[in-house]
């Protein structure tokens, strides 16, 4: 089954320097990202691990954003074509996240990471799509992978920010707006 069958999340770090040596690997990844399954010989393998791609930009983000001829995915290998990128649900810009520093660390009690990991694992089994659909409707122009990416991102944000399952309409709107912004960055 590989990594996607054994883990909840498979992260690829430094994807900007990633070399694709097997041309079939990208097609397998596309199928998995679209359907949650891939073929291994004559067997269909189902898995539900999330894929995370982490990397750096090769130039300042201000230059990329200001130039209409560039995009945020330029550092990816050419094999990561539009069909692969369109399967990404969300683009989280690292430049908007504060860098680790002593000022954000504590010398008081903190979360035990294995406990947090188990809590997140339990939350993966929950579906929070109903919270969104009960309060908001995506426009008719939002369909297919766009709608799926937005709904899945909202569901994930609700689990992280409101694990108890209760949020106000304004809090839900905040998650929806963030999900739409992250999906627009993919496009």
Regions flagged by a language model, labelled:
Residues 1, 34-49, 65, 72-80:
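Conserved Walker
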Residues 3, 21, 25, 80-84, ...:
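Helical mechanochemical/support elements of P-loop NTPase systems and associated helical scaffolds
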Residues 3-15, 87-98:
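P-loop NTPase motor core
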Residues 6-32, 46-49, 56-67, 83-84:
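Conserved AAA+/SF3 P-loop NTPase catalytic/coupling segment centered on the Walker-B
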Residues 26, 66-70, 105-109:
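Short secondary-structure boundary/capping segments
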Residues 39, 53-56:
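A conserved active-site cap/scaffold subdomain adjacent to cofactor or substrate pockets
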Residues 65-99:
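A short helix-turn-beta junction within AAA+ P-loop NTPase domains corresponding to the substrate/partner-engaging
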Residues 89-187:
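Conserved NTP phosphate-binding and transfer environment spanning the P-loop NTPase/kinase superfamily
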